[in-house]
Amino acid sequence: MADLEEQLSDEEKVRIAAKFIIHAPPGEFNEVFNDVRLLLNNDNLLREGAAHAFAQYNLDQFTPVKIEGYEDQVLITEHGDLGNGKFLDPKNRICFKFDHLRKEATDPRPYEAENAVESWRTSVETALRAYVKEHYPNGVCTVYGKKIDGQQTIIACIESHQFQAKNFWNGRWRSEWKFTITPSTTQVVGILKIQVHYYEDGNVQLVSHKDIQDSLTVSNEVQTAKEFIKIVEAAENEYQTAISENYQTMSDTTFKALRRQLPVTRTKIDWNKILSYKIGKEMQNA
């Protein structure tokens, strides 16, 4: 082991540490970070070399953050990344600094949004917040409006998590939806992601995603937002149902094919009455 450590360069050590951090399960960033810190045993090297991994983790996980003085949380995503550690809160029209290690937002300041698409963004956000409130007990959403390749584009992100460390499981739902504002009809593109980690008496992870495409009729802002939410709701309901049914099927068929739940005799052994069994008598006479 000592020879292996001598062979690894600092660059290689940091690369391995960063990989562990980026793939930390939902709600377990601190635990993974602390373990990696002990293994690396060099705080300066970890901070300088793996800082990009801290940022990538928060961007990938749609990490929600509360900004002091503002009611609603905002998601940390690539769509709100303004560079130099600053992020956009489109609802409140502010930008703020974000510490990727501490997961804290500071220094909120006014920020002018894309005026040309703001009315569309606001309509979609209003409809999406109502939907998230109805379907996600701990849900947070952020809606962006921006020009991409000259086209006015709406990007809607949803995050919801349950961290139950005392019960040995954590999970997170993420979904991202995007469409351009074009006359008559447009294409909606979405991706849905679920990640769950269960680690009591074992280590089981569910990592699943699904890509969605659908067409959306574009009329006025309010009606378009309503039609967009119908697409989101139908797709996310179908995905959740499919995941649940798939695991029920696995429980009923696949797992049973791997291992018998009961012995060949189809009866469970009553260990309290083991001495009444023939094998128990033989054991007693032995």
Curated annotation (Swiss-Prot):
The modification Phosphoserine is found at S9. InterPro entries: CapZ_alpha, CapZ_alpha/beta, CapZ_alpha/beta_2, CapZ_alpha_1, F-actin_cap_asu_CS. It comes from the Eukaryota. The modification N-acetylalanine is found at A2. Keywords: Acetylation, Actin capping, Actin-binding, Phosphoprotein. One of its GO terms (biological process) is actin cytoskeleton organization. GO terms for cellular component: cortical cytoskeleton; F-actin capping protein complex. GO terms for molecular function: actin filament binding. Pfam families: F-actin_cap_A. Belongs to the F-actin-capping protein alpha subunit family. Component of the F-actin capping complex, composed of a heterodimer of an alpha and a beta subunit. Component of the WASH complex, composed of F-actin-capping protein subunit alpha (CAPZA1, CAPZA2 or CAPZA3), F-actin-capping protein subunit beta (CAPZB), WASHC1, WASHC2, WASHC3, WASHC4 and WASHC5. Interacts with RCSD1/CAPZIP. Directly interacts with CRACD; this interaction decreases binding to actin. F-actin-capping proteins bind in a Ca(2+)-independent manner to the fast growing ends of actin filaments (barbed end) thereby blocking the exchange of subunits at these ends. Unlike other capping proteins (such as gelsolin and severin), these proteins do not sever actin filaments. This is F-actin-capping protein subunit alpha-2. It comes from Felis catus (Cat).
